[in-house]
Curated annotation (Swiss-Prot):
Superkingdom of the organism of origin: Bacteria
Coiled-coil spans in chain: none
GO process terms (BP): NAD biosynthetic process
Protein name: Probable nicotinate-nucleotide adenylyltransferase
EC annotation from Swiss-Prot or TrEMBL: 2.7.7.18
Keyword rRNA-binding belongs to the record: no
Top-level taxonomy: Bacteria, Pseudomonadati, Pseudomonadota, Gammaproteobacteria, Thiotrichales
Enzyme superclass (EC): transferase
Family: Belongs to the NadD family.
């Protein structure tokens, strides 16, 4: 592996952020010996509905969630870029700002199963490596075009600055932001599902009501 900075990329709408985002990111950080993990809220998600709260509020919730983990950083680059949040554009901007850094894009199996449908997926691999996170014992998709991409780029350990894919079993909580928004709308407790300070922020700002 290169001796330059190794930065993990954890992108998402984070609407709201919860422990299902945070725990896998921590395990990837340590397993791949990353220098830091960037949390990048999407400005305008391409493959899902628009977020229910403002980009600024989602960023503030992310900052609260990660403030006690020094290796976790909030990066607002997709908000700064504006427009649809295509990963390849984000990586191009990151690489331009930090040409000596190497980037590792976190992706769950559900997202990776549609990777061949992403805008310029080849460009993504030209700019970064990918870590596909999955539950222990759960296979990574190996059928069809996505399976071929995985097999063509898979390595046991990252040795280059881009173009490689590793897979990593992580603790994955059966938890979604959709379910959390439903709990919050119904007035159900969200204790032990998200950081306490994030829940407090949501209640104070009357979000997801």
């Amino acid at each position: 592996m290169q001796t330059n900075r190794l930065i993990g990329i954890n992108g998402g709408t984070f609407d709201p952020i919860h422990f299902g985002h945070l725990r896998p990111a921590l395990e990837v950080l340590h397993a791949l010996h990353l220098d830091e993990m960037r949390f990048i809220p999407a400005y305008q998600p391409v493959h899902r509905a628009s977020p229910s709260v403002s980009a600024q509020q989602r960023c503030e919730m992310v900052q609260l969630a990660i403030q006690n983990q020094p290796s976790f950083k909030l990066d607002t680059i997709e908000l700064d870029l504006g427009g649809p949040s295509y990963t390849v554009n984000t990586l191009e901007a990151l690489k331009k700002a930090e040409p000596d850094a190497s980037f590792v894009l976190m992706m769950g199996t559900d997202a990776f199963a549609k990777f061949n449908q992403w805008h310029d997926w080849q460009g993504v691999l030209n700019l970064a490596n990918i870590v596909v996170t999955h539950r222990p014992g759960e296979p990574v998709p190996r059928d069809g075009e996505v399976g071929q991409i995985f097999m063509n780029h898979w390595v046991p350990n990252l040795t280059e600055a881009s173009g490689q894919i590793v897979d990593l079993p992580v603790t994955q909580l059966d938890l979604s932001a959709t379910a959390l928004r439903s709990y919050l709308k119904n007035g159900d407790p969200v204790d032990y599902l998200m950081p306490e300070n994030v829940a407090r922020y949501i209640y104070e700002h009357q979000l997801y009501q």
